[in-house]
Amino acid sequence: MKILGFTFPDDLLYEPEKHVWVRIEDNSVVSIGVTDLGQYMAGKIFQVTAKQKGEKVNGRSVLFSIESAKWIGKFRLPIEGEVFDVNEEVVKNPSIINERPYDSWIVKIRVEDMDIIKRTFKPIQEVYKQFEEEAKRVVR
């Protein structure tokens, strides 16, 4: 789906306030990344720091942080589990998030309760209006 020129693939789930997407990989692992609109708002991303593989995470944990010339963001999500994988390509070359936000997952989490994912993250059809309002605000 396109919203004011920004792409939001239909097969992902979204959290519009944090501008993140989730891809359910199997019944316990999810990939997490930044939306097209989120990368646009951040500007050129020059650093990504992520939890290490094997680390436990909970709703207070910073799963990853992103730095750009105009913004630093720490991403906490209501997820409990363990870091299953870290995208080292993104850590080494963070600007690929700007180029390919949906191919550039940052972390994969083995989630303890998949119902939390389904309650927190929504299909684009359910959060379209929130993203549309945000896009109108930032695009001039």
Swiss-Prot record:
One of its GO terms (biological process) is glycine decarboxylation via glycine cleavage system. Keywords: Lipoyl. One of its GO terms (cellular component) is glycine cleavage complex. Its cofactor is (R)-lipoate. Disulfide bonds: none annotated. The modification N6-lipoyllysine is found at K70. InterPro entries: 2-oxoA_DH_lipoyl-BS, Biotin_lipoyl, GCV_H, GCV_H/Fam206, Single_hybrid_motif. PROSITE patterns: BIOTINYL_LIPOYL, LIPOYL. It comes from the Archaea. Residues 29-110 form the Lipoyl-binding domain. The keyword Coiled coil does not apply. Binds 1 lipoyl cofactor covalently. Belongs to the GcvH family. The glycine cleavage system catalyzes the degradation of glycine. The H protein shuttles the methylamine group of glycine from the P protein to the T protein. The glycine cleavage system is composed of four proteins: P, T, L and H. This is Probable glycine cleavage system H protein 3. The lineage of its organism: Archaea, Thermoproteota, Thermoprotei, Sulfolobales, Sulfolobaceae. The gene is gcvH3.
